[in-house]
Regions:
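N-terminal helix-turn-helix DNA-binding core of bacterial DNA-binding proteins
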Residues: 13-56, 77-78, 82-86
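Short, charged, low-hydrophobicity "junction" segments
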Residues: 1-5, 40-43
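Glycine-centered, phosphate/nucleic-acid-interacting loop/turn motifs that mediate DNA/RNA or nucleotide
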Residues: 68
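Basic, amphipathic "hinge/linker" alpha-helix immediately C-terminal to the N-terminal HTH DNA-binding motif
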Residues: 77-102
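Amphipathic alpha-helical dimerization/coiled-coil segments
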Residues: 2-9, 13, 32, 93-129
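Short beta-strand "wing" residues that participate in macromolecule-binding interfaces
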Residues: 72
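Short, hydrophobic-biased segments on the C-terminal half of alpha helices
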Residues: 61-62
Length: 129
């Protein structure tokens, strides 16, 4: 459930829920791709969707698997090796939590868009740095 922002509370803009494992661009694209394909994706399909090289995708998949966010399955089809990647239940849960934090960030950003930029009202003695 999304929390309603409380203005100026301590840590208000810390966004602690931004999961560092997911937040990296390549891993975010992998997790998002897998979340939208509940039956999983083959390595080459995932590579194409995320525009990653074989080595780059392999390394990010390893990090996500070690974090328990994805499962990697090895098998054969037509005597050719295949790798299937699938989002775990824990991965799905953490991705949803991550998305909720992003929604809070978007809410904050929209409020900035609506508010006009103003010069601060300062007493004498202040000057721009």
């Amino acid at each position: 459930m999304k929390k309603k922002p409380i203005s100026d509370s301590p840590g208000r803009f810390a966004y602690d829920g931004l999961d560092r494992v997911i937040h990296e661009k390549a891993r975010l694209s992998i997790i998002t791709s897998l979340a939208t394909h509940p039956n999983g994706l083959l390595f080459n399909d995932l590579k194409d969707l995320c525009a990653l090289t074989d080595g780059n995708l392999s390394r990010h998949l390893q990090i996500l698997a070690e974090a328990g966010l994805i499962q990697i399955w090895k098998g054969f089809k037509d005597n050719r090796p295949q790798t299937l990647c699938h989002l775990t239940e824990e991965g799905r849960k953490r991705f949803v939590e991550y998305i909720n934090v992003l929604e809070n960030i978007v809410t904050d950003a929209v409020s900035v868009e609506k508010a006009p930029a103003e010069e601060p009202k300062l007493s004498k003695g202040w000057s721009p740095a």
